[in-house]
Amino acid sequence: MNEQADMILLEIEEKMEKSLEALGREYAAVRTGRANPNILDRIMVSYYGVDTPLKQVASISVPEAQQLYIKPFDKSILKDIETAINTSSLELPPRNDGTGIRLTLPALTGERRRSLVKDVEKMAEAGKVAIRHIRRDGNEHLKKLGLTEDDEKGYLEDVQALTDAYVKKVDELTKEKSEELLDV
């Protein structure tokens, strides 16, 4: 066995794992009808003129199953947080109570659930494409090593096995998220 080729295989697996984790984080940000602070991950607040992630300027809690409460560390940015939420794609009206902001998540309609499932499927396809790109790059690196034909074939089969395994994990994650979205 070739030490360089083994290192390339490890690197490929690490990159595929990171792609899967990134997809998991994207899925966590998809609203399911239950309050989840991760849906606010993409919200950026103008804090002293700098766009800052909401999580860095406020604590986010889940007081009820359908509600999020955002309490800023600095009350002077309550209006900025409210503006950031209003301009986001969340379509959730913020309620400012003077010390924090409440977001009540309405129940998802059947049509909205199906639309979210389609979005999840698009994310899954992008995740699979990323994994296939990792496979392609890994195969190119392996071919440049000048291995014997048999060794090269064995390593390329290993890379394909990793690719198949991670694509299957993406499918499982997608099925799980889709079922969660369609569960009324």
UniProtKB/Swiss-Prot annotation:
BP GO annotations: translational termination
An example Gene Ontology molecular-function term: ribosomal large subunit binding
Sorted UniProt keywords: Cytoplasm, Protein biosynthesis
Pfam families reported for this sequence? RRF
Q: Which GO terms describe its cellular component?
A: cytoplasm
User: Which pairs of positions does the record mark as disulfide bonds?
Assistant: none
Question: Which InterPro entries has this protein been placed in?
Answer: Ribosome_recyc_fac, Ribosome_recyc_fac_dom, RRF_sf
- Subcellular compartments: Cytoplasm
Q: Does the keyword Isomerase apply?
A: no
Reported function: Responsible for the release of ribosomes from messenger RNA at the termination of protein biosynthesis. May increase the efficiency of translation by recycling ribosomes from one round of translation to another.
The protein's matches in PANTHER family, at most eight in alphabetical order, are given as: MITOCHONDRIAL RIBOSOME RECYCLING FACTOR PSEUDO 1, RIBOSOME RECYCLING FACTOR
Q: What does the sequence similarity comment in the record state about its family? A: Belongs to the RRF family.
Spell out the protein name for this chain. Answer: Ribosome-recycling factor
User: What gene, per UniProt, encodes this protein?
Assistant: frr
